[in-house]
């Protein structure tokens, strides 16, 4: 499906080499200040063009078509479109019948019996433009509640930061070309990416997301837990293969006496849970880690088959990220924002008092 969310519904559309990509956000309350400069800044952060990303250069200028009047949301669907300006579709002519390893080519073809071979169509990282635009709109609502979502890269390939989570430098990441959270490892991360690119290869990355200013009570029990929604959102990003919340995998190695977050004087003494208990936020920072596989598009010679079953050896052309996880950090923030904004709106009917308050009743 191309629709995400319950009360705040996000729909993305468009393909890598189509006319445009974009999104529709339905359910945003009226009266939220619309920050078009912030929207554009988020899209600019996601853009390629550097030696650490795809050479494909797009202006990515957002056009807001509806849902905003005199600088504020109207309560009606917000439509945003970004036109594709720099697609080189001829680079993919030799791939029309070929299944690229680790791409969605094989599965898309066998599910739909048709696929857009130009840049991967919907499975391209280009689709994330829509996610970032939608996440930027969600952030405008979260601002009203003091909720801040930040992401950055803490690992590239075998290089992984050993800093404690509270030591990650988000101010440095804002200035870093690769959104690096550990100043001492930035050069190692960059060299790893460039070495992969120069070897006609690619490399994976690990992204850390922190949400501060959290409120108590976001999320539902059982099947709509906040952690379930966040994992769903992050795993839906192309190239993501794993997500951790709080201690994540480490929790399976711990004892309860260590993993439990004790309380004293109305405060939690630790945050092993990553800010979520029983599927509901407890007011502590949300802590998430998202792991991206190496970009499937590499320039080394590879083996595969075509749709007729013939064995083939081929080399890719085109423009591709040597490490898709770098720009993926911007996308991770966007998806977390969409989840939290949706949960905020769902809470208006979580209990009778909330519902009465929405109508000014006691």
Swiss-Prot record:
It holds the Pfam family Chorismate_synt. FMN binds at residues 122-124, 238-239, 278, 293-297, 319. NADP(+) binds at residue 46. InterPro entries: Chorismate_synth (IPR000453), Chorismate_synth_AroC_sf (IPR035904), Chorismate_synthase_CS (IPR020541). It catalyses: 5-O-(1-carboxyvinyl)-3-phosphoshikimate = chorismate + phosphate. Pathway: Metabolic intermediate biosynthesis; chorismate biosynthesis; chorismate from D-erythrose 4-phosphate and phosphoenolpyruvate: step 7/7. GO terms for cellular component: cytosol. Its EC number is 4.2.3.5. Belongs to the chorismate synthase family. This is Chorismate synthase.
